[in-house]
C-alpha cells in the first residue's frame, strides 16, 4: 500500500437516520499526490449520495502531533452538493485514542532500513462528535449529532501541504 498511498482519513458513522462512510486518500509522489474521495451517505438504509465528484473535503484547526510529527485536524468535513440539496458531514476530534509510529516496535535494523527507504508511517485513531446536516437552498432542514470514531493513516513523509488540507 505504501507504494500507492501517502495518507488517508477514513471514517464511518451512524447518526440519526443516516449512515456515512467517508474517506480522503492521497496518492504517493509517483502518482502526483492526487487525491481521491470515497463517500457514501445513506438514509434509512437507502443510499442517497455516493457520487464522489460531488464531494469536497476540508480540514480545520490542523496541528502537528507531538508523538508522530504528522499534521492532525481537529475537524474533517465532507460536503456533498447535488442540485438544491447539500449534506455536510463533520467529524470533530475530542480525543486521540491511539498514536502509533508504525516502525517503533520493529527491530532496530528494520527501523533503520525503513528510515533509509523513506518510510515514515504513523497511525492515529480519534473519537469525537459527528454532525450530519442537510441544507435545501442553503437553509438547514435537518441536523443530527452523535459520537464517532475515525482514523488517519500516514505511510509517507509529511509534506507542507498536508498541514493545510483542502480539496475543492
Where are the predicted features?
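Structured soluble/peripheral alpha/beta segments that form catalytic or ligand/cofactor-binding pockets
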Residues: 1-168
Amino acid at each position: 500500500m505504501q507504494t500507492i498511498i501517502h495518507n488517508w482519513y477514513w471514517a464511518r458513522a451512524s447518526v440519526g437516520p443516516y449512515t456515512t462512510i467517508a474517506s480522503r486518500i492521497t496518492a504517493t509522489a509517483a502518482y502526483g499526490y492526487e487525491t481521491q474521495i470515497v463517500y457514501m451517505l445513506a438514509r434509512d438504509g437507502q443510499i442517497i449520495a455516493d457520487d464522489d465528484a460531488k464531494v469536497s473535503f476540508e480540514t480545520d484547526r490542523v496541528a502537528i502531533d507531538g508523538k508522530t510529527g504528522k499534521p492532525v485536524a481537529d475537524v474533517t468535513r465532507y460536503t456533498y452538493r447535488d442540485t438544491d440539496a447539500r449534506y455536510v458531514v463533520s467529524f470533530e476530534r475530542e480525543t486521540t485514542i491511539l498514536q502509533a509510529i508504525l516502525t517503533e516496535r520493529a527491530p532496530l535494523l528494520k527501523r533503520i532500513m525503513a528510515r533509509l527507504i523513506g518510510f515514515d508511517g504513523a497511525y492515529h485513531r480519534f473519537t469525537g462528535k459527528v454532525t450530519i446536516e442537510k441544507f435545501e437552498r442553503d437553509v438547514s432542514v435537518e441536523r443530527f449529532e452523535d459520537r464517532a470514531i475515525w482514523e488517519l493513516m500516514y505511510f509517507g513523509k509529511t509534506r507542507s501541504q498536508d498541514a493545510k488540507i483542502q480539496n475543492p
